[in-house]
Amino acid sequence: MAIEVIDNFLDKDEFNKIQSCMISNNFPWFYSDYVSHEDEKNKFYFTHSFYKDLKPQSVFFTMLDNLLNKLEIKSLIRVKGNLHTKSNKIKYNNFHTDFSYKHKGCILYINDNNGFTYFKESDKKV
Protein backbone atom coordinates (compact mmCIF):
# COMPACT_ATOMS: atom_id res chain seq x y z
CA MET A 1 0.00 0.00 0.00
CA ALA A 2 1.51 3.31 -1.09
CA ILE A 3 0.88 6.24 1.23
CA GLU A 4 1.32 9.76 -0.06
CA VAL A 5 1.14 12.74 2.28
CA ILE A 6 0.34 16.08 0.64
CA ASP A 7 0.57 19.01 3.02
CA ASN A 8 -1.66 21.98 2.20
CA PHE A 9 -3.53 20.02 -0.49
CA LEU A 10 -6.27 22.68 -0.49
CA ASP A 11 -5.65 26.39 -0.67
CA LYS A 12 -6.11 28.19 2.63
CA ASP A 13 -9.52 29.72 1.81
CA GLU A 14 -11.00 26.42 0.68
CA PHE A 15 -9.64 24.59 3.71
CA ASN A 16 -10.89 27.30 6.10
CA LYS A 17 -14.38 27.09 4.56
CA ILE A 18 -14.59 23.34 5.22
CA GLN A 19 -12.98 23.58 8.65
CA SER A 20 -15.24 26.43 9.82
CA CYS A 21 -18.33 24.52 8.79
CA MET A 22 -17.30 21.20 10.36
CA ILE A 23 -16.29 22.67 13.72
CA SER A 24 -19.29 24.97 14.01
CA ASN A 25 -22.12 24.34 16.46
CA ASN A 26 -24.49 23.94 13.50
CA PHE A 27 -22.74 20.95 11.92
CA PRO A 28 -24.46 17.64 12.77
CA TRP A 29 -22.37 14.79 14.17
CA PHE A 30 -23.86 11.37 14.93
CA TYR A 31 -22.80 9.00 17.69
CA SER A 32 -21.30 5.62 16.76
CA ASP A 33 -20.81 2.87 19.37
CA TYR A 34 -17.57 1.58 17.84
CA VAL A 35 -14.72 2.78 15.63
CA SER A 36 -13.76 -0.31 13.62
CA HIS A 37 -15.39 -3.46 14.95
CA GLU A 38 -18.75 -3.97 16.66
CA ASP A 39 -17.19 -5.97 19.50
CA GLU A 40 -15.02 -3.04 20.60
CA LYS A 41 -15.85 -1.81 24.06
CA ASN A 42 -15.70 1.83 25.16
CA LYS A 43 -14.42 3.08 21.79
CA PHE A 44 -16.99 5.50 20.46
CA TYR A 45 -16.74 8.38 18.04
CA PHE A 46 -18.97 10.64 15.97
CA THR A 47 -19.53 10.53 12.23
CA HIS A 48 -21.13 12.53 9.47
CA SER A 49 -22.06 10.78 6.22
CA PHE A 50 -21.60 13.07 3.22
CA TYR A 51 -21.94 10.42 0.49
CA LYS A 52 -22.91 6.73 0.54
CA ASP A 53 -24.89 4.23 -1.55
CA LEU A 54 -24.21 6.16 -4.77
CA LYS A 55 -25.81 9.39 -3.57
CA PRO A 56 -25.25 12.39 -1.34
CA GLN A 57 -26.40 11.85 2.25
CA SER A 58 -25.92 15.40 3.50
CA VAL A 59 -26.81 18.95 2.52
CA PHE A 60 -23.15 19.70 3.27
CA PHE A 61 -21.89 17.42 0.48
CA THR A 62 -21.53 20.25 -2.07
CA MET A 63 -19.15 22.01 0.31
CA LEU A 64 -16.61 19.34 -0.71
CA ASP A 65 -16.95 19.83 -4.49
CA ASN A 66 -13.54 21.50 -4.97
CA LEU A 67 -11.79 18.89 -2.82
CA LEU A 68 -13.37 15.99 -4.71
CA ASN A 69 -12.64 17.56 -8.11
CA LYS A 70 -9.01 18.08 -7.16
CA LEU A 71 -8.71 14.39 -6.23
CA GLU A 72 -9.72 13.37 -9.79
CA ILE A 73 -11.86 10.51 -8.52
CA LYS A 74 -12.89 7.79 -10.98
CA SER A 75 -15.76 6.44 -8.91
CA LEU A 76 -16.88 7.79 -5.56
CA ILE A 77 -17.68 5.14 -2.94
CA ARG A 78 -18.08 7.02 0.34
CA VAL A 79 -17.32 10.37 1.94
CA LYS A 80 -17.47 10.44 5.72
CA GLY A 81 -16.38 12.76 8.48
CA ASN A 82 -15.00 11.29 11.70
CA LEU A 83 -14.78 13.13 15.00
CA HIS A 84 -12.83 11.70 17.92
CA THR A 85 -13.24 13.47 21.23
CA LYS A 86 -10.33 14.98 23.14
CA SER A 87 -8.32 12.59 25.28
CA ASN A 88 -5.41 13.09 27.65
CA LYS A 89 -3.67 10.05 26.19
CA ILE A 90 -3.41 8.55 22.73
CA LYS A 91 -5.98 5.81 22.16
CA TYR A 92 -5.28 3.11 19.59
CA ASN A 93 -8.15 1.65 17.60
CA ASN A 94 -8.19 -1.76 15.95
CA PHE A 95 -6.80 -2.05 12.45
CA HIS A 96 -9.38 -2.29 9.72
CA THR A 97 -9.85 -2.09 5.96
CA ASP A 98 -12.63 0.14 4.71
CA PHE A 99 -13.57 -2.11 1.77
CA SER A 100 -12.61 -5.66 0.78
CA TYR A 101 -11.95 -4.71 -2.86
CA LYS A 102 -9.17 -2.62 -4.40
CA HIS A 103 -9.70 1.10 -3.81
CA LYS A 104 -7.96 4.31 -2.86
CA GLY A 105 -8.68 6.38 0.22
CA CYS A 106 -8.17 9.97 1.24
CA ILE A 107 -7.89 11.49 4.71
CA LEU A 108 -8.27 15.23 5.21
CA TYR A 109 -7.32 16.30 8.71
CA ILE A 110 -9.41 19.30 9.80
CA ASN A 111 -7.28 20.21 12.83
CA ASP A 112 -3.82 19.74 14.24
CA ASN A 113 -3.70 17.53 17.31
CA ASN A 114 -1.45 15.07 19.08
CA GLY A 115 -3.06 12.09 17.37
CA PHE A 116 -2.22 10.29 14.15
CA THR A 117 -3.33 7.58 11.75
CA TYR A 118 -1.17 4.46 11.86
CA PHE A 119 -0.91 2.24 8.78
CA LYS A 120 0.04 -1.30 9.78
CA GLU A 121 1.32 -2.59 6.41
CA SER A 122 3.80 0.25 5.95
CA ASP A 123 4.43 0.81 9.67
CA LYS A 124 3.81 4.50 9.02
CA LYS A 125 2.26 7.16 11.26
CA VAL A 126 0.58 10.10 9.54
What are these regions (language model features)?
Residues M1-K74:
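Non-heme Fe(II)/2-oxoglutarate
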Residues Y51-V126:
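Catalytic core of non-heme Fe(II) oxygenases with the double-stranded beta-helix
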